[in-house]
UniProtKB/Swiss-Prot annotation:
Its main location: virion. This is Glycoprotein 5. It is a multi-pass membrane protein. The gene is GP5. GO terms for cellular component: membrane; viral envelope; virion membrane.
Amino acid sequence: MLSMIVLLFLLWGAPSHAYFSYYTAQRFTDFTLCMLTDRGVIANLLRYDEHTALYNCSASKTCWYCTFLDEQIITFGTDCDDTYAVPVAEVLEQAHGPYSALFDDMPPFIYYGREFGIVVLDVFMFYPVLVLFFLSVLPYATLILEMCVSILFIIYGIYSGAYLAMGIFAATLAIHSIVVLRQLLWLCLAWRYRCTLHASFISAEGKVYPVDPGLPVAAVGNRLLVPGRPTIDYAVAYGSKVNLVRLGAAEVWEP
């Protein structure tokens, strides 16, 4: 596990702020934080309007469009003319109305803050490393934390329409819930039978025989407080000795 973490760090290098410029991280954030929903992309573009150099937007009477990294990402209308440059917000407002109408039902962490988006970028870049490390140190605490994160992103998916992402996190939540609940069940059972397991012997037919825990297992005969071995009614416990053998028993403990 440790070697895998070291290998990932060597392949990935230093944290993202060390080799991504602020604006590069911002551009990644624009198109990764909300890449599964058009409305999320539009919301980010509107928020980052002060950096119009990142986008090449043009407008005419019949067309508005923007390009990003030489790829046309937004186009409305026909007969586009790229001789007249405009801010990206003008293009988006022409197509989708004013800011207030667009942001009416946007979740707060999309509307507020480029910094939040960069933090999200860092978290997702190092998510596998974090999970590998914390699963090896605090396995169930990590699973519970991941369940909480999954719930947050399910809410985000419902708000923003990113149903694919919501489905992925819902599946993660379900799997981790099963693992955690299974462990909790075992803990509850261990607590429920904390005395029975150490102070008695449960026979195949379900009868409980008291045991002297002070005696070793190999003491004369056994550790039962009552003399002799417990009588096993095979017909009651297994139906027959044949059924017991079919169940894979290596040997039959006869009275």
